[in-house]
Amino acid sequence: MAHEVHRIKPKLGRTQIFWVFLAFRVLNAVLTRTFFQADEFWQALEPAHWKAFKYGELTWEWKFGVRSYLFPMIFELTYRLVSLSSILLHYALLLLSTIGSDLLILLLPKYELSWQVAEDLKRLPFDVTRSFEYYGVIYAPKIVMAVLASIGEYYIVRFVQKLYLLTLDKRNEKEEEERRSGLSEITKFALLLSLTNFFNCFFITRTFINSFEMILTSIALYYWDWTGGQMIKESSFTKSLIFAFLACLQRPSSGLIWVIPSISLILNLVGKKQYHLLFITFSKVLRSFFLVFTANAIIDMYFYEKVTFPFFRFLKFNFTTPLSKFYGVAPWHFHFFQSLPIVLGASIPAFAFGLFFPLSKRSFPKKYLNPFFQVKLTILLNLLVYSTLPHKEFRFIFPLQPLFILISSFGLLRLDRDYWKRLSGLKSLLWLVPFVSVFIALLLDTFHESGSIEVMKFLHEEPEIDSLGFIMPCHSTPGQSYLHRSDIQDLWSITCNPPLHLLGDPEAYSKLETYMDESDHLYDDISAFIYKNFPPPFRKDLRSPGKTYSHEWPTYLVVFEHMENAFLKDFLKDSSYIEYNRFFNSLAHWDSRRSGDIIIYYKLPFDYSDIPAADI
């Protein structure tokens, strides 16, 4: 059976498939310059930056130890490579500039211009390497993520090809030849559906753990034994277990994907009384788990500097306490009627057809041995279980994307063969749909919420910043992964830490309802929050004697337009603050607090406290 899978090859070779994905995703990643959700930065790039450059800020998840460091470590290594490259570049340029400036002075010592150029040459290595390091910090993780995404999508196509060949009807030679000739066609459909999927174009190259989980799952699904036990002795099955366990240790919920395939495999081995294969299976499972768990534990110990098992803390926080509700509660049908359409995109019709109609005419001795039955049941199980959890987001079901593309590809193949020949005119129009999806995704990648990124790039370029503050919902911008400055003495933002003190509290459910974080207090009553937590912005001698404040007014103050209109514009109009710059962020936003532009206020060096009160 293993040889059967590799005997027939499509017209588009494996190397070509990978390079198509890589070229497209690198472009996709480089063009992406917008903000989607905080986890893209604060759960991947920020801890990596903190570890690589020794400065930055960690969110509560990293302080509490609920995150595994494997994924961020990829970017730490990336940052370290960027840093090393910038150091080597600096010394190379320093050598060249020193030689160049000395030669210039030696040859043309009488000209003042020669001395000026020589001074500029000496400064050049510092300016170039500073820019090189910053752009490396910004773009190197994008390239790395594009490579990882390409690997994941490549294995999605391989997974589709594998199941296509495994589900051929061997009893009908004529049909078998017809279906074998369709391998190139199914490859083309899988390639197209993955490349032009709206959510893939918008999400897959962003540094979310869900993207990494999907990539690991794609590899594991391809190497999985879909024959019911005939390939258990192969090294490919071991690879599947390793990548599956890696995904599970990053996010334990990934284990749901493997419930149905595992049960089907065990049932078949038990039914056939192949106990020796069952023993080999469990042996491989234990060895693979031990290997992955040990490696992952070492990586986590490297980051936390003590023995830490984020896997168990993640389960405790999300499944044994109500604290996950702190980040929002969605209705039970959210994943069925919102997440699924968003992740599927334009492939909804093909997916629906593939889901409700048989995709293989091959008969299986047991229904549960049919790979398509396992895949469909896996999708249903995951959606049902995720629907029982209070906190829901689109990206939580993204690891199911390989299964979605599998069903959609086979659905599209059958639609193409059985129906579209009668609708040749409509078929040409339908080819426009995927490209419209890409266009919309690119608009969101380059336009909507671009201010959250651009403001950090701008602040990086400012010559001197003594203090910088963000009065906006927590984590509305990246941190040091885009700011990349260690010289700011006072850097703060509004926080939104969950009530970790309620862990283990029997009254956590009721207390959670009344808990308010700093962001909640701010927007509950903006004026009261400002007067309580900030000193008067006009005169230092107006401060209440002996009173300490949570925040001081910074030299640079960053706010959303909503905050400006609601309070700060009038409040600061007689202060030394001026509007310094403004960045477009969104035309509309689901969160009204983040609506409009992002504005930078700058506090002029002139201070009213320099003038005696009697003279005002």
Swiss-Prot record:
GO terms for cellular component: endoplasmic reticulum; endoplasmic reticulum membrane. It is an enzyme of class 2 (transferase). InterPro entries: GPI_mannosylTrfase (IPR005599). Pfam families: Glyco_transf_22 (PF03901). It is found in: Endoplasmic reticulum membrane. Its main location: endoplasmic reticulum. GO terms for molecular function: alpha-1,2-mannosyltransferase activity. Keywords: Endoplasmic reticulum, Glycosyltransferase, GPI-anchor biosynthesis, Membrane, Transferase, Transmembrane, Transmembrane helix. It is a multi-pass membrane protein. Belongs to the glycosyltransferase 22 family. PIGB subfamily. This is GPI mannosyltransferase 3. It comes from Saccharomyces cerevisiae (strain ATCC 204508 / S288c). The lineage of its organism: Eukaryota, Fungi, Dikarya, Ascomycota, Saccharomycotina.
